[in-house]
Amino acid sequence: MQRFTDFYAAMHGGSSVTPTGLGYIPMVIEQSGRGERAYDIYSRLLRERLIFLVGPVNDNTANLVVAQLLFLESENPDKDISFYINSPGGSVYAGMAIYDTMQFIKPDVSTLCTGLAASMGAFLLAAGKKGKRFTLPNSRIMIHQPSGGAQGQASDIQIQAREILDLRERLNRILAENTGQPVERIAVDTERDNFMSAEDAVSYGLVDKVLTSRAQT
């Protein structure tokens, strides 16, 4: 997955973009009887139960997403959470931390692709509550097998190879469950980078609906 993340960074000037890493984050001023209060835009949207994954999946972004999921569950365990994804993917381990938390908490997590959901980004997109997984019409979704490198003694390389194969089998099995596709087809379709349009992603079972307006939600 690192290979595609590097390509994504090159297409964006060599830098990764996350909500916490932007040079400028808009502020929202709210007025009440107690006076004015300023929020950064992402904190304000968190109050509306919106979470964003923007840029590569790594330990830092996973930690932020997991913390927000747990916080929103504690605020209201019966109200849906909306998870907006625009990500080229990244670390399988970090992504699985997000995935497991999505399944662990009580609220339904609705997912929406805005731009790109590739690799682990696509995996998390498909992990939303069935019937509540969406994409915008010009988004792109890409699935592929996990990748990684190893160095050291032959025994060390063998251990890493077994781990990658185990991860591939685990990811394929979960993706098959979430899409309704046979695991054998998942294995074939993820052999190389497999890009899909929004409509193709619906047909494949990665998402449930293409949204063109807010009224459709």
From Swiss-Prot:
It catalyses: Hydrolysis of proteins to small peptides in the presence of ATP and magnesium. alpha-casein is the usual test substrate. In the absence of ATP, only oligopeptides shorter than five residues are hydrolyzed (such as succinyl-Leu-Tyr-|-NHMec, and Leu-Tyr-Leu-|-Tyr-Trp, in which cleavage of the -Tyr-|-Leu- and -Tyr-|-Trp bonds also occurs). It holds the Pfam family CLP_protease. It is an enzyme of class 3 (hydrolase). The active site is at 119 (nucleophile), 144. One of its GO terms (molecular function) is ATPase binding. It is found in: Cytoplasm. Fourteen ClpP subunits assemble into 2 heptameric rings which stack back to back to give a disk-like structure with a central cavity, resembling the structure of eukaryotic proteasomes. This is ATP-dependent Clp protease proteolytic subunit. The lineage of its organism: Bacteria, Pseudomonadati, Pseudomonadota, Betaproteobacteria, Burkholderiales.
